[in-house]
Curated annotation (Swiss-Prot):
Reported function: Regulates a signal transduction pathway linking plasma membrane receptors to the assembly of focal adhesions and actin stress fibers.
UniProt KW Ubl conjugation keyword: no
Binding of GTP, residues: 12-19, 30-37, 59-63, 117-120, 160-162
Residue ranges annotated as propeptide in the record: 191-193
UniProt cross-references to SUPFAM superfamilies, sorted A to Z: P-loop containing nucleoside triphosphate hydrolases
Record's protein name: Rho-related GTP-binding protein RhoA-B
Keywords: Cell membrane, Glycoprotein, GTP-binding, Lipoprotein, Membrane, Methylation, Nucleotide-binding, Prenylation
S-geranylgeranyl cysteine: lipidated positions: C190
UniProt GO molecular function: GTP binding; GTPase activity; protein kinase binding
């Protein structure tokens, strides 16, 4: 039996952990060097609820320079991973300010999983010290859940690509969302004669 194919697009601020999350999930290795992404694609197989699913993973650039290029990755998307970094409250603020309007414009009705990346840094001393200097603190789990409700996300997950904590669960939830969304969608294809 052929695998079901689904397209996942990951969005969020530059350096919030999108690429690391995709690489750890698809290749099981953590990239130690940060190289800003323009566009990358990965493929990974996952089994969810006894269904074999081939996930096409579309990585995108979070930097503003690519705001006009990014929409090219949106057509035919089945699920969106919208990411912020737990060590960057500013990246959470950009979820309703920038990412939700963009995604809802280009991908209406596509389920969104809100993902808090870099969970391992929430209790990291150095991270806490640096944020305190700016009168900030790491994003709390409740703040992430509240934001997911606010933007109407399918779900909220936290993970650490570095420790692999929660990584598989993020993609299991995303795959379930993609499978449910397809079932619920009415066909709006028309035939021109």
């Amino acid at each position: 039996m052929a695998a079901i194919r689904k397209k996942l697009v990951i969005v969020g601020d530059g350096a919030c952990g999108k690429t690391c999350l995709l690489i750890v999930f698809s290749k099981d290795q953590f990239p130690e060097v940060y190289v800003p992404t323009v566009f990358e694609n990965y493929v990974a197989d996952i089994e969810v609820d006894s269904k074999q699913v081939e996930l096409a993973l579309w990585d995108t650039a979070g930097q503003e320079d690519y705001d006009r290029l990014r929409p090219l990755s949106y057509p035919d998307t089945d699920v969106i991973l919208m990411c912020f970094s737990i060590d960057s409250p500013d990246s959470l603020e950009n979820i309703p300010e920038k990412w939700t309007p963009e995604v809802k414009h280009f991908c209406p009705n596509v389920p969104i999983i809100l993902v808090g990346n870099k969970k391992d840094l929430r209790n990291d001393e150095h991270t806490r010290r640096e944020l305190t200097k700016m009168k900030q603190e790491p994003v709390k789990a409740e703040e992430g859940r509240d934001m997911a409700n606010r933007i109407g996300a399918f779900g909220y997950m936290e993970c650490s690509a570095k420790t692999k904590d929660g990584v598989r669960e993020v993609f299991e939830m995303a795959t379930r969302a993609a499978l449910q969304a397809r079932r619920g969608k009415k066909s709006n294809k028309c035939c021109l004669l």
